[in-house]
């Protein structure tokens, strides 16, 4: 079994105005909507229907796993998130294994460290500093039901520490179906559907749940050249529409060049453009976005 190892680096918000997550009504834990993959983040976060990159499927769409050419995919990534906004340093891990052509499993995790701030007591005296943090764990499964149809589900646990003694947690799930016709992957489902976050002082808040449809197609020119095209559309249940369009050019599966655009509108994630590149050799890849 050939296991593809990906050691990846991702620096988000390098192009245009993607300066972090926008406030959106009473949505809690917006970090659950962040794209953790340096491959898809370079494509405007498009690629939910693509089976070419599956390391971070537990954050995205596990229904793609049975259709992937990879038997295994493992990724580590670092994100310098929102360098001009509310900064955070994100460390992400994803691992996926496919067993035969029928079933695949995926796991992942993310840890975020926010910007340290000074703590002041009720009398105005300094009490030291505090560093907010976010944590997320995932597990998922993808199963091919018939030749051209697969189903997938992810389960997430997320926690957030905003201040000393102030922390929250939530559980959620993603459910997707994927159908392949004439080489085109078409997927639809829901993401981050789950529990609300309750606060003693301000009531209950929803996590960033959305309905999603996406498509992906790979164009091949001989054995040396290929282009992956991806289009995603999200409707957030608390309001707001988002869409992503991205492309990847690959030369002999050794060198990769990527670009994309994400339209955020009034949704949680602002609009941004992104670019990226990657190299791969003997199962080890380095990707930057």
Where are these regions (language model features)?
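Cleavable N-terminal export/targeting peptides
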Residues: 1-31, 35-37
